[in-house]
Amino acid sequence: MLGINYKTINSNSVGYKTDYEMRSFDFEEFLLAKGYSQTQIDSLLLHMQKLEPFTENEFELFRELFLDFSVLGGMPAVIKAYLESNNFSKALQIQKQLILDYEEDVKKYSTGVEQKKILEVYRRIPAQLAKEFKKFQYTKISTKARSKDYFGCVEWLKDAGVINKCDCLNFPELPLKGNVDNNKFKLYFADTGLLVASLDEEASDELHENKNLGVYKGALFENLVADALVKQGFGLYYFKKDNSTL
């Protein structure tokens, strides 16, 4: 895959296994983990579908729950640590360890110089999302970086379930896949909580203490939406023309 050398994995006999795509918790699963019933969750969804206003108390409750979820993300070990300790510090420790585990997996399942390139792409995502225009730029990794040298690294991370890729469209027309500009795209973390844990200390503290999702020029909002769409089975696309973005 464009220069990526996957280490050999023992093959499985065709027809003797079933594959499942596993992702971190979404907001509904977070609420279930918090002890809310499916009936309560369905009622919440119905209110939104009907555009019925919540009471002030309901609004504040669900707002706080969503902000908590936005900072924590949906990794099961992180949610478990938070529910057991009722504080973000323990959850943040788990998040940072998971990030290190991801990097160890890159070293384990990729080979040669590709290891370095994959890690460079992964580690640069938070800084790239901090830009006003969040299109991923290889030149922000190195002034001499070229797309043909790094594109396979992006696909490696995407296939591994570590990131989500949002493709730019030449035209906002169907079929979307047929209108993709392969040289323009945005990259998001597959779990928003891990993005929060990857930010610089000041931004991370602001999010954990004050839950200010406006830091990083709206990157957290974009990552949350991308995460939610992918978990619902949608592909990610954007369209930019002149000075406007759709």
Sequence positions of predicted segments:
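Conserved Walker B catalytic segment
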Residues: 1
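Conserved protein kinase catalytic core
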Residues: 4-5, 197
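Interdomain motor-coupling "hinge/lid" segment immediately C-terminal to the ATP-binding subdomain
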Residues: 6-130
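Accessory nucleic acid-recognition modules appended to NTPase machines
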Residues: 79-246
